[in-house]
Amino acid sequence: MVTLNIYSIIKMKRFPKRNYLRKTKVSFFNRSQRHFSQHLNIDIIGPLFKITRKDEKHYNFQYNDGLNILDTPFNNDDDHCTPGKLYFSDSKNICKYLGFGDNLRKISLPIDNPDFKMTKCLYGEKYGANMLIFGEKFDLDKVETYQKMILMDIDIRAGNDNAMIIAAQKGNLEIVKFLVESGANVKSQDNCAVRLASEFGHLDVVEYLYKSGANVKADGNYAITWACKNGHLPVIEFLTSVGADIKAAQNLPIKMAAIGGHLNVIKYLVDRGANISTDNDYVFNIACRNGHTDLAEYAVSLGADIFSDGCYGIDHAIRYNHYKIVDKFIGT
């Protein structure tokens, strides 16, 4: 069986030389019964790719090298991310989907197979087929993959620098540096890269992005707020040193730290002026709700009024069976 990818078809048809990152309309014609049962007129941009997870499964379908044939009826509608299709995208758009997996697979289509079916999804620049041929596999956690992407005419800035943002979220500094040096904007999507790097505790990435021009106070001091929620004290210390506001949004960082139960972060913020009694002793209330006895004790030591009208901490402790806290503050 002859199998070709779309990029090869374009070159074989001896079309005028062009930039293959530009949109090229490729038509499939039903010239005989051994080709297609219908005419497909779908816009394809360059070579084709798919993102897969480590186990290379999706909707319980196991992908393998070579030909993959859908084992359920083909879903011929234009919905996306629904069962009944094997999904893929093109070189202009594949980087929009990097967050959905761990591998980049180069694919081709068995266009000479009379049973081959394909549709374009209504939302998102991707396609669905009942057959795909898996070629090379590239690890999305290796910088070499992104270097090869450029050689394969993949738009590494697709989705408003989605590749850089995903790398920042994962803490892959080498990839972040490569993408920035290749033209990615560290401020894309309201400084999303530094916000996510902070949220997930990747100090080296946060420092690099800040030095490269990212705004650590973007989106209402999102970076320090979510670093507090997840207890990333080294990131919090750095963000504070470069101007992040620990009192942002009515002391939201200390409230988020309380939700996460991070006493060390709470103490750090209090030492720098955060108000532990904010919002009717929210810190004490949420500590009781989540069973964080040490945090509840610390809040009381700094003046939390456990019997005030707006303080529901003890009620929460009783409701959620945190009897150690109940015994601590009101006895048996």
Swiss-Prot record:
InterPro entries associated with the record: Ankyrin_rpt (IPR002110), Ankyrin_rpt-contain_sf (IPR036770)
Repeat region (ANK), residues: 159-188, 190-218, 219-248, 249-278, 280-308
Repeat recorded as keyword: yes
Superkingdom: Viruses
Key word Cytoplasm present: no
Keyword list, A-Z: ANK repeat, Repeat
Classification via PANTHER family: ANKYRIN REPEAT PROTEIN, GH09064P
Official protein name in the record: Putative ankyrin repeat protein R896
